[in-house]
Amino acid sequence: MGITIKKSTAEQVLRKAYEAAASDDVFLEDWIFLATSLREVDAPRTYTAALVTALLARACDDRVDPRSIKEKYDDRAFSLRTLCHGVVVPMSVELGFDLGATGREPINNQPFFRYDQYSEIVRVQTKARPYLDRVSSALARVDEEDYSTEESFRALVAVLAVCISVANKKQRVAVGSAIVEASLIAETQSFVVSGHDVPRKLQACVAAGLDMVYSEVVSRRINDPSRDFPGDVQVILDGDPLLTVEVRGKSVSWEGLEQFVSSATYAGFRRVALMVDAASHVSLMSADDLTSALERKYECIVKVNESVSSFLRDVFVWSPRDVHSILSAFPEAMYRRMIEIEVREPELDRWAEIFPET
């Protein structure tokens, strides 16, 4: 009825692997590559925890099937969830290595909670599939090549080396990130609303901000006759409309907002946003009941941002990227979006002077 990994044994092996990962400088490159790929933006956050747990189980007992998820699967299976929740997660907090997922039970999520073994997993998000296949293939190789506990231990050490590196990077960024983050927001706010091409820069800013959150963001030139959706910037998910944003550099009335919400929902959008930044604009935020009325009337979610800085703060809150990644990627994304929407050259140069690494 499966194999039970003793908690004390697992803790001892994991601690030893962590110490080796923290002190060694030569690791198995294929496992380093796999663990690094699981830190990409599209990679599900739970996969690193699953990989660490599977390798730990095999490093404790070489009879273990590393692709098992639930102990009931067969006589070589172990409980991925029990070992992860009982040993891996608490020790990641104690020792300070990053698992990607921050919850106490990362295995209690798709696709792991509903299957007994990796071979049974058939339903997984399209973007997640390549990462699941990589993990599954790597663990299958462990079994096919009959990894010993020592070989599994070395693979675990390599994966933990990446976990430690990520944790250290986050710690370094966290020390100064509040200042740097505030600086990026303030510099972008000042740049966008001053100089030439303010409407274009506003739209580029929204598109670049959404690039930090979503993978498919559509932004077209202002007054482009080929526009086939209401709004200036759209997010498309699996070919279907998800979110549309109206970007305005002048005052917007409640009537104007309702007209946009109406046309957006008619086009199939159920998430509708307005991003307006104009000195003449009279705030719409003082009457939340009116926003709620629009939501009830048109059966959608309505979001209003009334400054560039407000919008960018939301980006930092909701993006799946870490702060360091946004700080690195946003200036380049903003530059690219400005070129796309045909912002004039002097403004591009001004942006490049603010962020010279763009």
Swiss-Prot record:
| Reactions listed under catalytic activity | Endonucleolytic cleavage of DNA to give specific double-stranded fragments with terminal 5'-phosphates
According to the UniProt entry, its GO molecular function terms are: type II site-specific deoxyribonuclease activity
Which Enzyme Commission number(s) are listed?
3.1.21.4
User: Its domain of life?
Assistant: Bacteria
Keyword list (alphabetical) reads: Endonuclease, Hydrolase, Nuclease, Restriction system
Among InterPro entries, the record links this protein to: Restrct_endonuc_II_SacI (IPR019066)
- For whether the record's keyword set contains Cell cycle, the answer is no
Protein name as it appears in the record: Type II restriction enzyme SacI
Q: Which organism is it from?
A: Streptomyces achromogenes
Q: Which gene encodes it?
A: sacIR
